[in-house]
Every structure is written in structure tokens, then in C-alpha cells.
């Protein structure tokens, strides 16, 4: 048998999926940041910067999509707990060939917000894709990943 820290918490002793019982855990401040990149052609980046795409303000709509997605994570990911989310931000850096996305989520609760940050980042990237796909079929979404998480029993973690 593996030590407790190595056991999968979302399966019971028979290997069936279960939602983890967090009822006895202490509430703590928790945060998570995820990042991702949406690669596209230079012409598409320029049109995005100048807000010349027919679907409108791509980054504004994508930001709202990311915030909404963070709030809906437990509806999308079956074993995620519904959480009271205290803060969500979605920020962008526009580079020559891609848009960098950074999504941060915060709560005061019994479980972390890593999935909420990853879901926010993913939905943001998908929205950018959706709003730009008519002019650029080569768009790719890459490197969606957790960058850092703070709080909780396992403490802080930072990607190096």
C-alpha cells in the first residue's frame, strides 16, 4: 500500500470514482494561477491588437469567458467541489505569434482552486480560438499548465 500522500483521493478501495470528503478540513486562503498560449499567424495577431476582427473585442470576451468558466468548473469537471470563489483575474500578453494567458483564482475554503484556474485558462484560450478561427485555421492552443498554487495542507507550490 502506498503512503497516504501517494494515494489517489478520488477513488475508493475498489477503484470506483468518489468525491473527496473535505468536510473536516480547515478553511484557509488558497490561490492558483494557470497559464497557456494561443498561437496564430502574424496577420491575425495584428487584427486582434487593432480590434479589427468581425466578432469584436476578442480579449474582452475571452476574459469574461474565463471568469465564467472558473465559476462553473464543478459543473464541467465531475469530481470538483462547488466553491465560493472570491477572485478571478484573466490577463494577456500579446506577443509576435501568440497570446499568453494568465488566470488567477482565489478562495477561502477547504479545497484548492487549481482546477478553476486551469478551466479559466482553457476557456479563455478556446474563446480566442473561436473568435479568430474564421480568419486563421492554423491556430493552436498550447502549454496550458498550473504555474503556482498557495495554501492548503500541501502548502505552496511554484513551477520552476
What are these regions (language model features)?
Residues 2-59, 64-79, 86-160:
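C-terminal binding/interaction regions
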